[in-house]
Amino acid sequence: MRAFVIAMECEAEAVRPALCDGDRLYVSGIGKVNAAAATQLAICEGADEIWNAGLSGGFGDVEVGGVYGVERAVEYDFDLAKLNGTAVGVLDEMKTPYIPLSRIEGAELVVPKFGGWRTLATGDHFNDREDDYELITRTLGASLRDMEGAAVAHVCMRRGVPCFSFKCVTNVAGGGSMTGQYEENRERCLSVLRDAAVALLRRRR
Protein backbone atom coordinates (compact mmCIF):
# COMPACT_ATOMS: atom_id res chain seq x y z
CA MET A 1 0.00 0.00 0.00
CA ARG A 2 1.24 3.48 -0.92
CA ALA A 3 0.58 6.02 1.84
CA PHE A 4 0.75 9.81 1.80
CA VAL A 5 1.56 11.73 4.97
CA ILE A 6 0.51 15.33 4.42
CA ALA A 7 0.56 18.08 7.03
CA MET A 8 -2.37 20.36 6.14
CA GLU A 9 -5.79 19.79 4.63
CA CYS A 10 -5.12 22.34 1.86
CA GLU A 11 -2.05 20.32 0.83
CA ALA A 12 -4.05 17.10 1.01
CA GLU A 13 -6.65 18.59 -1.34
CA ALA A 14 -3.86 19.29 -3.82
CA VAL A 15 -2.64 15.69 -3.68
CA ARG A 16 -6.04 13.93 -3.76
CA PRO A 17 -6.52 14.17 -7.56
CA ALA A 18 -3.32 12.15 -8.00
CA LEU A 19 -4.31 9.23 -5.78
CA CYS A 20 -4.85 5.81 -7.32
CA ASP A 21 -6.90 2.85 -6.12
CA GLY A 22 -5.34 1.43 -2.98
CA ASP A 23 -3.54 4.62 -1.97
CA ARG A 24 -4.20 6.05 1.49
CA LEU A 25 -3.94 9.64 2.63
CA TYR A 26 -3.06 10.62 6.21
CA VAL A 27 -3.49 14.29 7.16
CA SER A 28 -1.13 14.50 10.10
CA GLY A 29 -1.34 18.10 11.24
CA ILE A 30 1.64 20.44 11.45
CA GLY A 31 4.87 19.56 13.23
CA LYS A 32 7.35 16.72 13.69
CA VAL A 33 5.48 14.69 16.31
CA ASN A 34 2.25 14.76 14.30
CA ALA A 35 4.11 13.73 11.15
CA ALA A 36 6.00 10.92 12.88
CA ALA A 37 2.82 9.57 14.49
CA ALA A 38 0.95 9.55 11.18
CA THR A 39 3.87 7.83 9.45
CA GLN A 40 4.03 5.12 12.09
CA LEU A 41 0.26 4.61 11.84
CA ALA A 42 0.48 4.28 8.05
CA ILE A 43 3.23 1.66 8.34
CA CYS A 44 1.30 -0.26 11.00
CA GLU A 45 -1.70 -0.28 8.64
CA GLY A 46 0.33 -1.85 5.85
CA ALA A 47 2.13 0.93 3.95
CA ASP A 48 5.17 -0.34 2.08
CA GLU A 49 6.13 3.10 0.75
CA ILE A 50 5.55 6.54 2.24
CA TRP A 51 5.20 9.83 0.37
CA ASN A 52 5.41 13.30 1.87
CA ALA A 53 4.42 16.26 -0.29
CA GLY A 54 3.59 19.84 0.51
CA LEU A 55 4.60 23.47 0.62
CA SER A 56 7.94 24.60 1.97
CA GLY A 57 10.19 27.55 2.51
CA GLY A 58 13.39 27.96 0.55
CA PHE A 59 16.91 29.39 0.63
CA GLY A 60 19.48 30.38 -1.94
CA ASP A 61 18.74 29.63 -5.57
CA VAL A 62 15.31 28.00 -5.19
CA GLU A 63 12.35 29.81 -6.75
CA VAL A 64 8.84 30.50 -5.53
CA GLY A 65 6.56 28.10 -7.38
CA GLY A 66 9.40 25.68 -8.10
CA VAL A 67 9.02 21.97 -7.37
CA TYR A 68 11.96 20.18 -5.75
CA GLY A 69 12.63 16.58 -4.87
CA VAL A 70 14.07 15.77 -1.45
CA GLU A 71 17.08 13.45 -1.54
CA ARG A 72 18.01 13.85 2.12
CA ALA A 73 16.56 15.53 5.19
CA VAL A 74 17.86 16.80 8.51
CA GLU A 75 16.22 17.77 11.80
CA TYR A 76 17.93 21.10 12.39
CA ASP A 77 16.41 21.56 15.86
CA PHE A 78 17.84 18.25 17.18
CA ASP A 79 20.98 18.98 19.21
CA LEU A 80 22.87 16.56 21.47
CA ALA A 81 26.16 18.48 21.25
CA LYS A 82 26.45 19.10 25.00
CA LEU A 83 25.65 15.47 25.78
CA ASN A 84 27.85 13.54 23.37
CA GLY A 85 29.64 16.13 21.21
CA THR A 86 27.83 15.32 17.98
CA ALA A 87 26.97 18.01 15.45
CA VAL A 88 23.54 19.61 15.28
CA GLY A 89 21.07 17.32 13.55
CA VAL A 90 22.89 14.07 14.26
CA LEU A 91 20.37 11.65 15.72
CA ASP A 92 21.58 9.48 18.58
CA GLU A 93 21.78 6.32 16.46
CA MET A 94 23.52 7.96 13.46
CA LYS A 95 26.95 9.21 12.38
CA THR A 96 25.60 11.91 10.02
CA PRO A 97 22.81 14.48 10.36
CA TYR A 98 21.30 13.48 7.02
CA ILE A 99 18.44 11.02 6.61
CA PRO A 100 18.39 9.56 3.08
CA LEU A 101 15.23 9.46 0.97
CA SER A 102 14.45 7.60 -2.24
CA ARG A 103 14.59 9.52 -5.51
CA ILE A 104 11.47 9.79 -7.64
CA GLU A 105 12.45 8.24 -10.95
CA GLY A 106 11.84 10.46 -13.97
CA ALA A 107 10.69 13.50 -11.97
CA GLU A 108 12.68 15.89 -14.12
CA LEU A 109 10.94 14.54 -17.24
CA VAL A 110 7.32 15.02 -16.17
CA VAL A 111 7.29 18.11 -13.90
CA PRO A 112 7.77 21.34 -15.90
CA LYS A 113 9.18 23.38 -13.00
CA PHE A 114 11.19 20.58 -11.39
CA GLY A 115 14.26 22.20 -9.84
CA GLY A 116 16.30 19.14 -8.98
CA TRP A 117 17.18 17.30 -5.79
CA ARG A 118 17.71 19.17 -2.53
CA THR A 119 18.38 18.83 1.17
CA LEU A 120 15.36 19.54 3.39
CA ALA A 121 15.74 20.98 6.89
CA THR A 122 12.88 20.22 9.27
CA GLY A 123 12.15 21.81 12.63
CA ASP A 124 9.26 22.92 14.79
CA HIS A 125 9.73 26.61 13.91
CA PHE A 126 7.99 28.97 11.49
CA ASN A 127 10.00 32.16 11.70
CA ASP A 128 12.63 34.42 10.14
CA ARG A 129 15.38 33.88 12.73
CA GLU A 130 18.83 34.77 11.40
CA ASP A 131 20.56 32.07 13.46
CA ASP A 132 18.30 29.43 11.87
CA TYR A 133 19.29 30.75 8.44
CA GLU A 134 23.00 30.38 9.16
CA LEU A 135 22.59 26.89 10.59
CA ILE A 136 20.34 25.59 7.81
CA THR A 137 22.21 27.01 4.84
CA ARG A 138 25.87 27.24 5.81
CA THR A 139 26.23 24.45 8.33
CA LEU A 140 23.75 21.91 6.99
CA GLY A 141 23.68 22.89 3.31
CA ALA A 142 19.89 22.77 3.02
CA SER A 143 17.85 24.83 0.58
CA LEU A 144 14.35 23.73 1.66
CA ARG A 145 12.67 24.03 5.05
CA ASP A 146 9.46 22.59 6.49
CA MET A 147 8.06 21.25 9.77
CA GLU A 148 7.41 17.58 8.93
CA GLY A 149 9.53 16.01 6.20
CA ALA A 150 12.58 14.83 8.15
CA ALA A 151 10.34 13.34 10.85
CA VAL A 152 8.52 11.30 8.19
CA ALA A 153 11.86 10.18 6.75
CA HIS A 154 13.21 9.36 10.22
CA VAL A 155 10.39 6.93 10.95
CA CYS A 156 10.72 5.36 7.50
CA MET A 157 14.45 4.88 8.00
CA ARG A 158 13.92 3.18 11.36
CA ARG A 159 11.25 0.88 9.91
CA GLY A 160 12.99 0.13 6.62
CA VAL A 161 10.25 1.63 4.44
CA PRO A 162 11.09 3.70 1.32
CA CYS A 163 10.30 7.41 1.66
CA PHE A 164 9.70 9.82 -1.23
CA SER A 165 9.16 13.56 -0.93
CA PHE A 166 8.64 16.61 -3.12
CA LYS A 167 7.94 20.22 -2.17
CA CYS A 168 6.67 23.41 -3.80
CA VAL A 169 8.33 26.57 -2.47
CA THR A 170 6.08 29.40 -1.27
CA ASN A 171 8.64 31.71 0.31
CA VAL A 172 12.36 32.33 -0.08
CA ALA A 173 14.66 33.86 2.53
CA GLY A 174 15.57 37.41 1.59
CA GLY A 175 12.40 37.94 -0.41
CA GLY A 176 10.53 39.80 2.31
CA SER A 177 8.44 38.59 5.22
CA MET A 178 8.23 34.80 5.23
CA THR A 179 4.64 34.89 6.43
CA GLY A 180 3.70 37.54 3.88
CA GLN A 181 5.24 35.57 1.02
CA TYR A 182 3.52 32.39 2.18
CA GLU A 183 0.11 34.04 2.29
CA GLU A 184 0.60 35.74 -1.07
CA ASN A 185 1.84 32.64 -2.90
CA ARG A 186 -0.02 29.81 -1.19
CA GLU A 187 -2.90 29.32 -3.63
CA ARG A 188 -0.68 29.49 -6.71
CA CYS A 189 1.77 27.03 -5.19
CA LEU A 190 -0.99 24.63 -4.18
CA SER A 191 -2.04 24.58 -7.84
CA VAL A 192 1.55 23.83 -8.88
CA LEU A 193 1.74 21.12 -6.21
CA ARG A 194 -1.44 19.52 -7.54
CA ASP A 195 -0.11 19.42 -11.10
CA ALA A 196 3.21 17.98 -9.92
CA ALA A 197 1.46 15.32 -7.84
CA VAL A 198 -0.66 14.19 -10.79
CA ALA A 199 2.39 14.05 -13.07
CA LEU A 200 4.56 12.15 -10.60
CA LEU A 201 2.10 9.81 -8.93
CA ARG A 202 -0.01 8.72 -11.88
CA ARG A 203 3.20 7.93 -13.76
CA ARG A 204 4.33 5.50 -11.06
CA ARG A 205 1.17 3.39 -11.17
Short names for language-model regions:
Residues 3-5, 48-52, 144, 163-165:
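Short glycine-aspartate micro-motif
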Residues 125-181:
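A C-terminal functional module that forms or caps the active site or interfaces directly
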Residues 1-45, 63:
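N-terminal short beta-loop-beta anion/metal-coordinating cradle
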Residues 47-58, 148:
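A short, hydrophobic beta-strand-centered structural micro-motif
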Residues 41-45, 62, 154-162:
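Alpha-helix C-terminal capping segments
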Residues 163, 168-205:
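Regulatory input/activation interfaces that engage signals or partners
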Residues 59-140:
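Mid-sequence, gly/pro-rich, charge-dense loop/helix-turn segments that line enzyme active sites
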